[in-house]
Amino acid sequence: MPPLKSSSPGPLGRWLPVLAWAGIIWTLSSGWFSGERTGAVLLPLLSALFPRATPGQLDAVHTGLRQLAHFTEYLILSVLLYRALDVERRWSLRAAVLALVLAGLYAGSDELHQWWVPGRGARASDWLIDVSGAAAGQGLLAARAQRFRPRPA
């Protein structure tokens, strides 16, 4: 009987999701996803869902949704980076820190990209939200590793 293959993906299987997600983030940083354009879609929807909300309240919800998107994008990127870096398949502080640093650097490059996109802008607050999402991703992975850690006999 032939030996079973390892379920651990190779380098391409680990890094392709990272590259694909980074491409999605880059696309979301384009002018197509500016506040003005997302507002044109979301504000009428929010207005229909919350007919008594003031325009200021609707704008605040729209802004909050955009910030939640930043947070979530980088939470996912951070988890994918960790998966690509953690070849041993057991929780590693080194891989977690490196994933967080790489996600933070990509977030910085994303903000610089937005600086040049009409209708977008670079904001330190967006970068902090991005890095917070990446840190949350690493926190979730660490908590999961702690929960499923083998207990000493």
Describe these PLM feature segments:
Residues 20-25, 95-114:
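Small-polar-interrupted transmembrane alpha-helices in polytopic inner-membrane proteins
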Residues 10-15, 90-97, 123-124:
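Membrane-helix interface segments
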